[in-house]
Amino acid sequence: MARIAGVDLPREKRVEVGLTYIFGIGRQTSNKILAATGINVDTRIKDLTEEEVNELRKLIDADYQVEGDLRREVSLNIKRLKEIRCYRGIRHTKGLPVRGQKTKTNARTRKGPKRTVGRKKKK
């Protein structure tokens, strides 16, 4: 298994797809990296030479913010929004959708499972 940026890449996958297992690298970024290094998109990870793996590793470490650093930056950005008490920060704090979606119905992913409020029966 090739290990890049602290992530074990699956051996049987194509390099294009395998790189997307690294947090912060999607298909488009993966294709840019492969174009820059000159590695064929259809190559399987198990078929990469040690030189090619090192080249990928160097390029990703130098030019891209991935894994722990990126996660830390995102969490610090959210923390800053919460501290300055802006609208987006308040939505994060309350666990509601941040980007303007309606919440009268739906929004269950952010709000969690439905909690029914009990009421007294009439006599």
Swiss-Prot record:
Q: How does it assemble?
A: Part of the 30S ribosomal subunit. Forms a loose heterodimer with protein S19. Forms two bridges to the 50S subunit in the 70S ribosome.
Gene Ontology molecular-function annotations: rRNA binding; structural constituent of ribosome; tRNA binding
Which gene name does the record give?
rpsM
Query: What Pfam family is a match for this entry?
Result: Ribosomal_S13
- Ribosomal protein among keywords: yes
What task does this protein carry out? Located at the top of the head of the 30S subunit, it contacts several helices of the 16S rRNA. In the 70S ribosome it contacts the 23S rRNA (bridge B1a) and protein L5 of the 50S subunit (bridge B1b), connecting the 2 subunits; these bridges are implicated in subunit movement. Contacts the tRNAs in the A and P-sites.
Q: Which UniProt keywords apply?
A: Ribonucleoprotein, Ribosomal protein, RNA-binding, rRNA-binding, tRNA-binding
Read off the PROSITE patterns from this record: RIBOSOMAL_S13_1, RIBOSOMAL_S13_2
Family, per entry = Belongs to the universal ribosomal protein uS13 family.
Segments carrying the region annotation (Disordered) are: 95-123
Name of the protein described by the UniProt record: Small ribosomal subunit protein uS13
Coiled-coil boundaries: none
- Report the NCBIfam families cross-referenced here: uS13_bact
Q: Which PANTHER family match?
A: 30S RIBOSOMAL PROTEIN S13/40S RIBOSOMAL PROTEIN S18 (PTHR10871), SMALL RIBOSOMAL SUBUNIT PROTEIN US13M (PTHR10871:SF1)
Q: Which InterPro entries match?
A: Rbsml_uS13_C, Ribosomal_uS13, Ribosomal_uS13-like_H2TH, Ribosomal_uS13_bac-type, Ribosomal_uS13_CS
Cellular component terms per the entry's GO annotation: cytosol; small ribosomal subunit
